A protein has these predicted regions:
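Short hydrophobic beta-strand element within catalytic cores of glycosyltransferases
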Residues: 317, 321-324
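Conserved acidic donor-binding segment of nucleotide-sugar-dependent glycosyltransferases
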Residues: 336-337, 341-348, 357-363
């Protein structure tokens, strides 16, 4: 992949972005020279700012405390747009939130729309934008499930929208998530995998061995604290090791909807002195914890609709082996024994067994750490987030073809996207 922030800025646009996360908080942290909370956070913000050097932006954050602020040429809006619960209350909340989003869009009058979630905001605001002939870029990091007839029927309106001829490009994070979209019915010729530019390479660090300092082995988890992410399964696996060995400590970085329940579960399992809940933590500190740990664990259950999370890249970059669930986003790209071990999602006993395997066999552990470089290489994508944005905006302004479409799932998996002006 290439550095994509050095190309010329496009003509002035009015860009509406609808997403999760708290853009205002991220801006505050960056302005106060705080380290970013997650991988490529400030990079992605810089990509939007580059597009809008001569334009205006409206960033709507879907699940924050309500606020409306202005920052330079950006208007920032946060709110509780995401409904809780179900039934008629859910439908009413969706209807009211959709009206609010469309009102914001009508007032702002965007020339371009990026929606970073495949949920109802894409259906409601995306349809409105297509009626107004506004270019729409669906930009995801989500796995699409197609297992049941009910799920397929539920997805039909979304698939029809994504296949609309006025949407030439649909992007998702890495190949497995893109393949899931194609399996769900999105035309392969418009599905492009993207990634963040690599900021470090595993070979910049030495591989690790299982040297013991005398204390417990250290496990690390970074991500949302929720049951669908498998954190409860991880706690139960640690409890099994606590009883049968080897001795381990667990560091949990992040926050989430089930944090209080998980803290209570850790207490009930007798893990108060073995598990530390650190909350949201600067990315550089999480990386240091991953390097210091013997294993990084990514126990996501199948129901959690993610691509390949950044924590996997980061663990491999610091040469720490990863213990992964068999999530459908992970299976196609990871080979057990090459930088990782794999267990059945939701199976705490098998997770404990995999952890014990890695922590009691020094030769296996050394082989896994050596394999992190090859595992990292296997999950690289040819198109970066910034290249994707630049390419799409230039295309909508009649300044060229969609170069990134040479990497759609209909055409295989080439190595890298050529720099602007370079031979393809």
């Amino acid at each position: 992949m290439v550095d994509d922030r050095q190309t010329a800025a496009p003509a002035a646009i009015r860009l509406l972005v609808i997403q999760f996360g708290d853009y205002r908080q991220a801006l505050w942290a960056r302005e106060h020279q705080q380290p970013e909370t997650y991988r490529a956070q400030y990079y992605s913000m810089a990509c939007f700012e580059k597009l809008l050097q001569r334009g205006q932006g409206l960033i709507v954050c879907l699940d924050t405390e309500p606020y409306e602020e202005t920052w330079h040429n950006f208007r920032l809006v946060g709110g509780r747009f995401i409904p809780r619960g179900g039934g008629w209350g859910y439908l009413r909340h969706v209807w009211l939130a959709s009206r609010r989003l469309i009102q914001l869009a009508e007032t702002f009058a965007p020339t371009h729309l990026i929606i970073r979630t495949p949920a109802w905001p894409l259906l409601m605001v995306g349809r409105w934008a297509l009626r107004q002939q506004i270019p729409v870029l669906p930009l995801f990091a989500d796995y699409f499930y197609t297992g049941t007839l009910k799920t397929r029927l539920k997805n039909l309106p979304l698939i029809r929208l994504l296949n609309h001829p006025a949407i030439p490009l649909v992007a998702n994070h890495n190949y497995p998530a893109c393949a899931s979209m194609v399996q769900a019915g999105v035309a392969a010729a418009k599905v492009v995998p993207y990634d963040w530019p690599a900021s470090r390479h595993p070979r910049e660090m030495p591989a690790k061995d299982l040297a013991r300092s005398g204390g417990p082995y250290r496990l690390c988890y970074a991500g949302q604290l929720s049951h669908p992410k498998g954190v409860g399964d991880l706690l139960k696996a640690v409890a099994l090791l606590h009883r049968a060995g080897p001795e381990v400590d667990l560091d949990l970085f992040g926050d989430g909807p089930d944090r209080a329940e998980l803290q209570e579960l850790a207490r009930r399992l007798g893990l108060d002195d073995r598990v530390r809940f650190h909350g949201l933590t600067a990315n550089e500190k999480v990386l240091a914890a991953m390097r210091a740990a013997q294993l990084v664990v990514v126990p996501s259950r199948h129901q959690y609709p993610e691509g390949i999370p950044c924590v996997i890249y980061e663990a491999l970059e610091v040469r720490t082996p990863v213990v992964l669930s068999d999530h459908p986003s992970f299976r196609p790209k990871f080979q057990p024994g090459q930088g990782c071990l794999m267990f059945r999602a939701g199976d705490a006993a098998q997770l404990a067994h995999r952890l014990r395997e890695a922590l009691t066999q020094p030769e296996l552990y050394g082989h896994l750490s050596q394999g992190t470089a090859a595992a990292w290489e296997a999950i690289q994508c040819p198109v970066t987030f910034g290249q994707l944005l630049d390419d799409w905006v230039a295309y909508t302004q009649g300044q060229g073809e969609l170069t990134c479409r040479q990497f759609t799932l209909a055409l295989g998996q080439p190595a890298v996207l050529a720099s602007p002006g370079a031979p393809a």
